[in-house]
Amino acid sequence: MARYRCCRSRSRSRCYRRRRRCRTRRRRCCRRRRARRCCRRRYKLRCRRY
């Protein structure tokens, strides 16, 4: 299982493998494979499409 990957800007945020740790804790990636979706901690890491 790959670790959580970081999401960049607010608009069109996507997941990246290169960044191991996120600068902002609220933005983290989905657990699903091949999913370039970002999640927010407030809603139990629910996935949102951008």
Swiss-Prot record:
Keywords linked to the UniProt accession: Chromosome, Developmental protein, Differentiation, Disulfide bond, DNA condensation, DNA-binding, Nucleosome core, Nucleus, Spermatogenesis
Tissue expression as described in the entry: Testis.
GO biological process: chromosome condensation; sperm DNA condensation
Domain of life: Eukaryota
Any Pfam family hit: Protamine_P1
Family to which this protein belongs: Belongs to the protamine P1 family.
Record-given protein name: Sperm protamine P1
Gene from which this protein is expressed: PRM1
